[in-house]
Structure formats: C-alpha cells, structure tokens
Swiss-Prot record:
One of its GO terms (cellular component) is cytoplasm. It is an enzyme of class 3 (hydrolase). Belongs to the HAM1 NTPase family. Its main location: cytoplasm. It is found in: Cytoplasm. ITP binds at residues 20-25, 61, 77-78, 94, 153-156, 177, 182-183. Mg(2+) binds at residue 48. Disulfide bonds: none annotated. It comes from Trypanosoma cruzi (strain CL Brener). It catalyses: ITP + H2O = IMP + diphosphate + H(+); dITP + H2O = dIMP + diphosphate + H(+); XTP + H2O = XMP + diphosphate + H(+). This is Inosine triphosphate pyrophosphatase 1. Its EC number is 3.6.1.66. Keywords: Cytoplasm, Hydrolase, Magnesium, Manganese, Metal-binding, Nucleotide metabolism, Nucleotide-binding. One of its GO terms (biological process) is deoxyribonucleoside triphosphate catabolic process.
Length: 196
C-alpha cells in the first residue's frame, strides 16, 4: 500500500486540502466526498503550466501546492474536448470561455458535421513529492446549438452529456450532475482507491 493510501485509509477523520478558488468546484467536491473525507479549501495562486495534458497540468499544480502547504492536497484540472477540433479547446477551455463565453464556444463548431465532445477531469492527490496519485473521470456528449440552463458554472450550459437525458449540465439539479459529471466520476475513482 502506498504511503498516500495509508494517509486516507488509516484514520476515521480523513482530511485533505482541496486547492481551488472556484466555489462551484469546491461545492461539488464536498458534496461527492461528504461523509468520507473532511475537505478543507485553500485558494492558492499557482502558475499553470501550458500543456495539452490535463494529467501533466494537474500533477504539476499538486506538487506546487504540496510544496506550499506541506500537507496532503487534492488538485483538479478539467478539459472540454471537441472531436471536430482534434480535442481543442481541451485544458485551455477556461481561457476560451473567459474570452468568448458560451456562445463563442458553440460558434467554434460552425461549419463542422459533428458536435461530439467529451469532458474529462483529473484529480491529483499528493501526500508527498513521492506519493502522487491521479484519478480520471470522463463524460461523452455533445455541444448544443445554443446555451441552455441557469445552473452550474463555466461551460455547463453548452455541454449535453450522453447520460443527461437531453439536458445540459446547467439544466440539471446538482444531485443529477454530481452523479454523472466527469468530476464526480473522478471522485468515485478516488474513493474506490482509498476504499472510502
């Protein structure tokens, strides 16, 4: 068993520091891990490496966060990948969204035959520089023709998951989204690894 596994398995008071400044992410993580892990939150202004790999980005941020906190951390990175664009915007979706918004994301697919896309989320748990574990969740779906829904955050109004019964993430109740989102799936993998 890895040292990081022992840190969560060996105590009835599991605790990890989630590194995010995004309140929506924090709420989703706390809802998914409620009753299993005490999630503390810290907002660290970490430089984000430029890479097309959410695994590399998440790992890099986790190691930096651990170096600052000197305690177990959980860091997440997400990508929204359009089939027609060879996987773009991918992990750059945050910057695309900030500059062009949901309608701009949709317009990126004008003239293409497919609106297929997938969302992926990677959580990196870092208990020390030598104990770095990663957990991925993926959700296939499509980009809708116009933003729909008022809930969620970020690009939730443009992504309709295959498992979503025709709704975008922004149209779903939190409980439904937290059951099928890539973030939820990655957290399920994390909980399974630690037998939580």
């Amino acid at each position: 068993m890895a040292e990081g596994s022992a840190l969560l398995r060996g105590s009835s008071n599991h605790k990890v520091t989630l590194v995010t400044g995004n309140d929506g992410k924090r709420r989703e993580v706390q809802a998914c891990l409620e009753g299993h892990v005490l999630v503390e939150n810290v907002n660290l202004d970490l430089p984000e490496m430029q890479s097309d790999s959410v695994f590399e980005i998440s790992r890099n941020k986790a190691l930096m966060a651990y170096d600052i906190t000197k305690s177990p951390v959980l860091v997440e990175d997400t990508a929204l990948c359009f089939d027609a664009l060879g996987g773009l915007p991918g992990p750059y979706v945050k910057w695309f969204f900030e500059r062009i918004g949901p309608t701009g994301l949709i317009k990126l697919l004008e003239g293409f035959d497919t609106r297929r896309a997938y969302a992926t989320c990677v959580f990196t748990y870092c208990a020390s520089p030598d104990v770095v574990l990663q957990f991925e969740g993926r959700c296939d779906g499509r980009i809708v023709e116009a933003p729909r829904g008022e809930g969620g955050f970020g690009w939730d109004s443009v992504f309709e998951p295959d498992e979503g019964c025709g709704q975008t993430f922004a149209e779903m109740q939190d409980e439904e989204k937290n059951r099928i989102s890539p973030r939820a799936k990655a957290l399920v993998a994390l909980k399974a690894h630690f037998c939580l």
